[in-house]
């Protein structure tokens, strides 16, 4: 029992099922952040996640969301100033009822950033049905001095020196990927 000697920590734990879900969510995001690392998560005696670690983000995405969805994803690649954006974004036909399938990574770190999630959603403008959200795994790289990771104790939030330019780069990256996927009339 990990917290047997520290009862103050134990009281903040959720149920076993809730803690298991939190571990699976974390492992899922890091599998998408590091496709070159093999992940295997077993929960309740069953395999919840297995990735090959072959370095292909599309293969990691398939392990998380299924081969069909991975095949539908669009490649995202864009650079603007010191910001580079890469990853996968779904076409407008691939969407979810919440933002949980939007994974954003900054310099290899999974972050929960409302401005960046908004930039991803904003790139789709009116292409998604109301109340629906895109599926995406977006990797943002920029110099360390352009981002502050010491905003949250868990390092889950970041602050940018120029948040607008980072958001603009994300929007442009996804918009370009979507434009490249549209059929020509």
Language-model-detected regions and their locations in the chain:
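N-terminal phosphate-binding caps/lids of nucleotide- and nucleic-acid-binding domains
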Residues: 1-185
